[in-house]
């Protein structure tokens, strides 16, 4: 614990809080164009081929975004909407692509949690 004299000499440093989604620039979502769509493997205990896309946003930044759900129709030059939200087992992936908006189709045959995957109500 510092003495009063030490505090007078050098004041306490403010803790700077880092944003978890800096590319969104305080917006809830952002639009972008896919520059590359590919699969990648997760960190140590897990094993899979996770679908991700490199997206160039309207503000000029380029980020890696996760494509949620089973199956997708994305390819290079697809226009997508991204939101915040990281994928814990993919380092560097801090954004999710919103399904069912712009060029991204909703997940087919999805019955539960449909609103998160842009799926219409089954008949």
Curated annotation (Swiss-Prot):
GO terms for biological process: translation. Residues 113-123 have a biased composition (Basic residues). It comes from the Bacteria. Keywords: Methylation, Ribonucleoprotein, Ribosomal protein, RNA-binding, rRNA-binding, tRNA-binding. Residues 103-123 are annotated as: Disordered. One of its GO terms (cellular component) is small ribosomal subunit. The keyword Zinc does not apply. GO terms for molecular function: rRNA binding; structural constituent of ribosome; tRNA binding. The modification 3-methylthioaspartic acid is found at residue 89. SUPFAM superfamilies: Nucleic acid-binding proteins. CDD domains: Ribosomal_S12. PANTHER family: 30S RIBOSOMAL PROTEIN S12 FAMILY MEMBER. With S4 and S5 plays an important role in translational accuracy. Interacts with and stabilizes bases of the 16S rRNA that are involved in tRNA selection in the A site and with the mRNA backbone. Located at the interface of the 30S and 50S subunits, it traverses the body of the 30S subunit contacting proteins on the other side and probably holding the rRNA structure together. The combined cluster of proteins S8, S12 and S17 appears to hold together the shoulder and platform of the 30S subunit. Part of the 30S ribosomal subunit. Contacts proteins S8 and S17. May interact with IF1 in the 30S initiation complex. Belongs to the universal ribosomal protein uS12 family. This is Small ribosomal subunit protein uS12. It comes from Nitratidesulfovibrio vulgaris (strain ATCC 29579 / DSM 644 / CCUG 34227 / NCIMB 8303 / VKM B-1760 / Hildenborough).
């Amino acid at each position: 614990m510092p003495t009063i004299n030490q505090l007078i000499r050098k004041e306490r440093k403010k803790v700077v809080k880092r944003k978890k989604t800096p590319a969104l620039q305080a917006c809830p979502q952002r639009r972008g164009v896919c520059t590359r769509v590919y699969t990648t493997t997760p960190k140590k205990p897990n094993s899979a081929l996770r679908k991700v896309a490199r997206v160039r946003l309207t503000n000029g930044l380029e980020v890696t975004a996760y494509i949620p759900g089973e199956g997708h129709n994305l390819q290079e030059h697809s226009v997508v909407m991204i939101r915040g939200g990281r994928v814990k087992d993919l380092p560097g992936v801090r954004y999710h692509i919103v399904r069912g908006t712009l060029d991204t189709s909703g997940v087919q045959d999805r019955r539960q949690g449909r609103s998160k995957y842009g799926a219409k109500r089954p008949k």
